[in-house]
């Protein structure tokens, strides 16, 4: 196993990142195993409608990397604090090389519980990658809050 450490230039300070102040292994390094096909990355978009700020708008983009025999399926479930699924979707993963980019259609949630500092309402997103027999091969997730920040007249 090899670990490559970069030393950045003094110009890296423009991005205000600490990589120009530090070099070497300064943080924890993790090594973990993944299945042959796995969820490499995902982006959640959770905002409120622009008219009344009551309806939640949920979007999800996922990158699946690797390849698997047969047809894999990607599923998500958005659950409230009681564990009740309020959104669910499942689609087949079409193998198009080693990286597959999947975008789910935006979904609307009426009367969503909004997130704020005073009322930090969070939903749980569960992502599951299943093999052709329906067995879960990779599972991940995160907490999701619905809010909108904007500047307007």
Give residue spans per PLM region.
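Secreted/periplasmic carbohydrate-active enzymes, especially glycoside hydrolases
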Residues: 1-153
């Amino acid at each position: 196993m090899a670990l490559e450490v970069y030393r950045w230039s003094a110009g890296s300070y423009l991005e205000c990142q600490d990589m120009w102040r530090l070099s070497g292994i300064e943080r924890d390094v993790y090594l973990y195993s993944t299945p042959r096909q796995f969820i490499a990355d995902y982006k959640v978009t959770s905002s409120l409608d622009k008219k009344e700020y009551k309806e939640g708008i949920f979007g999800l983009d996922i990158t699946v990397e690797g390849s698997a025999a047969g047809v894999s399926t990607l599923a998500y479930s958005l659950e409230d604090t009681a564990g009740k699924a309020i959104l669910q979707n499942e689609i087949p993963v079409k193998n198009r090389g080693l990286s597959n980019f999947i975008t789910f259609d935006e979904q609307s949630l009426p009367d969503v519980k909004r997130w704020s500092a005073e009322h930090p309402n969070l939903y749980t997103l569960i992502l599951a990658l299943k093999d052709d027999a329906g067995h879960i091969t990779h599972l991940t997730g995160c907490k999701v809050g619905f809010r909108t920040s904007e500047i307007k007249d």
